Amino acid sequence: MQPPRPVRRALLSVSDKTGILAFARSLSERGVELLSTGGTARLLAEAGLPVTEVSDYTGFPEMMDGRVKTLHPKVHGGILGRRDIDDAIMREHDIAPIDMVVVNLYPFAATVARAECTREEAVENIDIGGPTMVRSAAKNHKDVAIVVNSANYPAVVAEMDQHSGSLTLETRFDLAIKAFEHTAAYDSMIANYFGSQVPAYHGDAKQPSGRFPRTLNLNFIKKQDMRYGENSHQMAAFYTDPETPEASVATAQQLQGKALSYNNIADTDAALECVKTFTEAACVIVKHANPCGVATSDTLLAAYNRAYQTDPTSAFGGIIAFNRPLDADTAKAIVSRQFVEVIIAPAVDDDALGVLAGKQNVRVLACGNLQQPSPGLDFKRVNGGLLVQERDVGMVDLQDLSVVTERQPTEEEMRDALFCWKVAKFVKSNAIVYARYQRTIGIGAGQMSRVYSAKIAGIKAADEGLDVKGSAMASDAFFPFRDGIDAAAAVGVRCVIQPGGSIHDNEIIAAANEHGIAMIFTHMRHFRH
């Protein structure tokens, strides 16, 4: 085992200067000679730290508006030089060993995220010298430490104190892995951005923002290994997107309970994304990635009670999501009534945590304040490929709707229609949702024919003694035939909301008129497979 390597000389060159002054001071206080470039060097010098400009060290000035700063043999020889192997050649050419490199890269992602960013700006924010130093140091991690993240500064200083100014090979190897991950993600961003610019680059009139890159490079960070995947014979892990901008299962904090399973995470995501769509206090209960009970109300407790009563049988062992902080009364109702796998809410108050503490197997997550879903990409793996599409963040408002029947919906029917339309978006296709007074009373999910989803929704309502008469019905896609409308009329549905767009729309509308049903077209489909 190699003994810890002393850090005697460090090169610091960072775009993100978070924590760099304190870190540089810590290094200097421990006898480390500091080399630096440009703005980083000025910051250290103004703080009174002894620092040598790289241009003074190499005898070669920065040039070309800073494009060439560190690409010099005295820099890269000092980083790449193998101790005890290249010592003679380093002495011959007056190359001093550099034991630590502290670098983070030009803010390419932040630059191209601006709507007004030009290609020229993007080009100027492609770092060249930085990644070269990072990769050089990571390659020579046997002798050199590479630090690319300010979050690692305190741990590096602590280990140097533990080992008299030195770092272990294990730590240098771990830092090298982080460095390669950092440069891989950086190059991926650049490739994805310019790949999406191809149409504009070749004079195509199509807007480049509407294109997907020619090659797709993804950067996800492993959050946890799992006991197994969807089934016990499958290995699994959970990876998260470091750029996730909104509250999600990936960013949530687990407050108690066993480790989340693969299925827990998938179901919790479905529940949370559904509950986000409501502005009133809402509860969504999910089983096998399908909502089985959804309701809104004036209080969280009332919303939970109403959602649970939709389908108590399916709610057993389910996932419960709220869009308000969880309170003690609601927590008491849950644990007294049902077995639950996961509860997720923006926050969980202390009294509620006290109630749930008696059920330590219940996984409790706090996800933070909810925002409206942000645009992004959805992926579906197929054998030999990856389907990529824009995330379905579409939702309709009153002004988007068309009433196509003779009978107009009442205000209450319109509210119920919009409510169950939101729910239908999160139900596996073919999806049918019955709702009354902003509460689901029957959900038919995942059937191969739409009419059978409608029949199942009615059966579920009847099994729980819920009256469908006067309810609204949502369908995630258009009705191809009138049989779905006939099935809805048979159980007393009074209002139907659906996308429209079938070649048989006239027949469907005629069926609704025949039954005295109000029908609303959304002109937006929400298939979910």
Swiss-Prot record:
Name listed for the protein in its UniProt record: Bifunctional purine biosynthesis protein PurH
Pathway given in the UniProt record: Purine metabolism; IMP biosynthesis via de novo pathway; 5-formamido-1-(5-phospho-D-ribosyl)imidazole-4-carboxamide from 5-amino-1-(5-phospho-D-ribosyl)imidazole-4-carboxamide (10-formyl THF route): step 1/1; Purine metabolism; IMP biosynthesis via de novo pathway; IMP from 5-formamido-1-(5-phospho-D-ribosyl)imidazole-4-carboxamide: step 1/1
Entry keyword set: Hydrolase, Multifunctional enzyme, Purine biosynthesis, Transferase
Pfam families, A to Z: AICARFT_IMPCHas, MGS
Annotated source species: Sodalis glossinidius (strain morsitans)
CDD domains noted in UniProt: IMPCH (cd01421)
Highest taxon listed in the record's lineage: Bacteria
Coiled-coil residue spans: none
Enzyme Commission designation: 2.1.2.3, 3.5.4.10
GO-annotated molecular function: IMP cyclohydrolase activity; phosphoribosylaminoimidazolecarboxamide formyltransferase activity
Biological process, per Gene Ontology: 'de novo' IMP biosynthetic process
Comment field on protein domains: The IMP cyclohydrolase activity resides in the N-terminal region.
